[in-house]
Amino acid sequence: MRGGIRAADEIIAFKVPVYGDNSGKSDMIDDTRSEHDLLGNRDIPADAYYGVHTLRAVENFPITGIPISIYPELISALAAIKQAAALSNMELGLLDKVRGDAIIAACEEIRAGRLHDQFVVDVIQGGAGTSTNMNANEVIANRALEILGHGKGDYGHLHPNEQVNMSQSTNDVYPTALKIATYHGVFHLIDAMAVLRKGFERKADEFKDVLKMGRTQLQDAVPMTLGQEFSTYGVMIGEDEERLREAALLICEINMGATAIGTGIASHPDYARLVCLHLVAITGMPLVTAVNLIEATQDCGSFVQLSGVLKRVAVKISKICNDLRLLSSGPRAGLNEINLPAVQAGSSIMPGKVNPVIPEVVNQVAFEVIGNDLTVTFAAEAGQLQLNAFEPIIAHSLFKSVSHMREACLTLEKRCVSGITANRERLRAYVENSIGLVTALNPYIGYANATAVAVEAHATGRSVYDLVLEKGLLPAATLAAILHPDVLTKPQSMLIRE
């Protein structure tokens, strides 16, 4: 993994021990501890940092087999929020220094990468992210208890809900964690897009004098350079680097301090301001507290906007890959204008066949991102009244889109774009034999002559170049000058015809 949000497919297997309730005597009593919730007592593995709420969530949501720990930036974001909350509550005199410092120490360990394997709830879950929030509360509480010299589960000294979750609700913690994690992932994606853009820019410079035929609707149009074609790809990608930066700013508005529905119940009047300040200091992000916390708690518009931009990126890069596959088609019976690097054998039955597998895999990532956008759209629309209960699938979809598209950009540049070569003679022959060349000659030989040349070239298969010379419409030197890439591919002053 190169960095950023990890792809979900890196998980091979995910199993969490599930123990029965305490109604009978356990054979593993020395290896478990008992925890209690409103549904009763449960045995928890003695060495587990998660607790009863997490255990029930694992049992209730065996959906994907992918734990939330697959997204380390989400886990770090949760720890950052709990740390900021503890600092704020201590500053407000609501949390004593001893327990507050222990919570902060536990959060810093998690942000450094420790205990991520204890975040075991499934990425898709009911409850608007409550299972994820409680998983974080329990892990932090039990590690803080250890720091204080107590055993795991000894919640009389420090409680997951009362101290770790103080002044908070899942309904402000979860969306804020999603925004923090996604923000960092988006900038990793932007970095990868810049790598791909620069790859196309290098090829544009390499191919700046290579003349070729442009095509509209797959038919010959007018000449251009291969450099112009590749430069366009770089511009397309660069535009969306900016769009992603704009979308990233939208997700910097958070609803911490909203608690349950945005009214701020069970929190101090100064808490929302303080927790945002501490989060800015911890994350380095330009976070701001939403003006209307009730609106911010129920509205998923920023996620919809970001997902839409990710779809835009996917559509553009997929279109570029379509072009690369088409331009390299053949090699004997296709366009064969460019060569893509051969990276693996292409067929189990056709010897010597090589396929454009890198553009193909990027196409598939784009299809996935487009599908993820539809999922985000439906999930955002399905919110009801003061809360959207479907943010877990929004999170999973956004994380996949950001992560997979990032890897796709890096792979496309490294294993395809950097090694592309031009079939220069083939490209030149296409230009010289194309009837579309008459469009470039029209200002010099006139529309009627250009039409006559086009009709004869089509009927006889002869080149426009040869027919113009044969008919004496232009001297060879003039024709050669007109066919220079600088003349054919840019606006020029027109010759005045007698």
Q: Where are these predicted regions, by residue range?
A:
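C-terminal lid/capping helical subdomain adjacent to the catalytic/cofactor pocket in oxidative enzymes
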Residues: 1-22
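Conserved, well-structured ligand/cofactor-binding cores
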Residues: 24-498
